[in-house]
Amino acid sequence: MAVEEGLAPYIPYLFKGVFTGIESKRKKALPQDLLRSLMTASLDDPELRKTRQALCLMFQFCGMAFVDFAHLKKENVRGGVLEYKRQKTGTPMLIEVQSTAWESLRELSSDVGKDSPYLFPFLKGIKVGKEAYKEYTSALAHFNRNLKRLARVCGVSIPITSYSIRHSFAMILK
């Protein structure tokens, strides 16, 4: 406005090279040794064991996002392959289920009701619209709380969320 009104001179590229975004100071990926300790910890608490199983599966499924993991349906696993569409983008995905993942997959999915379309016990599958979204956000918050509990039990002091699993997988691939 000041330039348009003649109160200030126009200076081309005045802010060239100036970063105007928000810089993230916190690393989202976990170091491999801490990730390994979360994946291999001996746990008595059944809820933390399920959280660890989900963490391991999400990592083995190529750093799968929690939203995709929670929305997997029983029909998405066929012939040793996990086939689904990303929730965020609709991109079709094919992931071979490794032999190391089957036991965790069976155990985690054993808590799902027979009438539920979902592979894992995070969502019930009976809500629609805003209620379905509320159910998902509640499941995500619950999972993240359990990840933090798991980290505390394992002596991991770095902040962790479901996104940390995805980011850790990507960083290890680099």
Model segments located where?
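Non-catalytic DNA-binding core/recognition domains of DNA-processing enzymes
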Residues: 1-3, 97
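Proline-centered turn/helix-capping motifs that create local helix->coil transitions or kinks
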Residues: 3-11, 110-116
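Basic, Lys/Arg- and aromatic-enriched nucleic-acid-binding interface segment
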Residues: 10-66, 70
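Conserved tyrosine-mediated DNA breakage-rejoining catalytic core shared by Y-recombinases
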Residues: 16, 71-108
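Active-site/catalytic core of tyrosine-dependent DNA strand-transfer enzymes
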Residues: 35, 98-157
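Short, contiguous acidic/charged loop-to-helix segments that flank catalytic cores in large enzymes
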Residues: 43-45, 83-96, 130-139, 157-161
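Short, basic (Lys/Arg/His-rich) helix/loop patches that form interaction surfaces
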Residues: 44-46, 144-174
